[in-house]
């Protein structure tokens, strides 16, 4: 059985606007040896499965600086530091990024974003009966294109690697499990 490692100390290394870097000195319970681990502390994130009455998903295209590619994704973003409700954040992000609003917003699932190096959680929120209601409200660092994609096309887009953002693929997996009645919400 795996035992959690004992943390001896933790010290901040840097503060970089969207995340903080810290160094944790821990003891390996198996060997007793000390090791430094670097952890990125970030606010939690939300991904939005926005389903229209016509069985389409509201999706966005945007340039991603890490990969240097334009990605096909679902709407989402970072929870503001004062926000505690991922469902409310998802409703806000959907409206700001796409102008869409819907009904029956609810949590579909949550995952550790990357437990090897990140301390945060990514929440997937389902919003049904989404319709275009408002103009978009991009912040100065956003440039997105909104499009509607038939739900039936999603598996092939993932298989063809047209949807390649790992957290989006996980969110779409939650959606698939919900559609098949395996994931209850």
Give the ranges of each region predicted by the language model.
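Nudix hydrolase/Nudix homology domain
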Residues: 2-5, 33, 70, 116-118, ...
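Conserved Nudix-box catalytic region and its N-terminal flanking loop in Nudix hydrolases
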Residues: 2, 37, 47-92, 138-140
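Extreme N-terminal tail/first-helix region
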Residues: 1-15
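Active-site-adjacent beta-strand/loop module that shapes the phosphate/pyrophosphate-binding cleft
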Residues: 25-30, 114-133
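Short, well-ordered beta-strand micro-motif
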Residues: 23-25, 50, 126-128, 148-150, ...
């Amino acid at each position: 059985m795996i035992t959690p490692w004992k943390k001896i100390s933790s010290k901040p290394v840097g503060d970089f606007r969207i995340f903080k870097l810290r160094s944790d000195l821990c003891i390996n319970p198996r060997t007793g040896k000390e090791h430094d681990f670097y952890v990125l502390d970030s606010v939690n994130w939300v991904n939005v499965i926005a389903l229209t009455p016509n069985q389409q998903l509201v999706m966005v295209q945007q340039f991603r600086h890490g990969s240097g590619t334009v990605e096909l994704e679902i709407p989402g973003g970072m929870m503001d530091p004062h926000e505690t409700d991922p469902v409310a954040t998802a409703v806000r992000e959907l409206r700001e990024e796409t102008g869409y609003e819907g009904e029956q917003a609810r949590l579909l699932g949550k995952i550790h974003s990357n437990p090897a190096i990140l301390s945060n959680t990514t929440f997937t929120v389902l919003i049904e009966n989404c319709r275009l209601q408002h103009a978009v409200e991009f912040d100065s660092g956003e440039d997105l294109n909104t499009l509607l994609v038939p739900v039936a096309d999603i598996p092939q887009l993932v298989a063809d690697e047209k949807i390649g953002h790992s957290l989006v693929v996980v969110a779409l997996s939650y959606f698939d499990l919900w559609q098949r009645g395996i994931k209850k919400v």
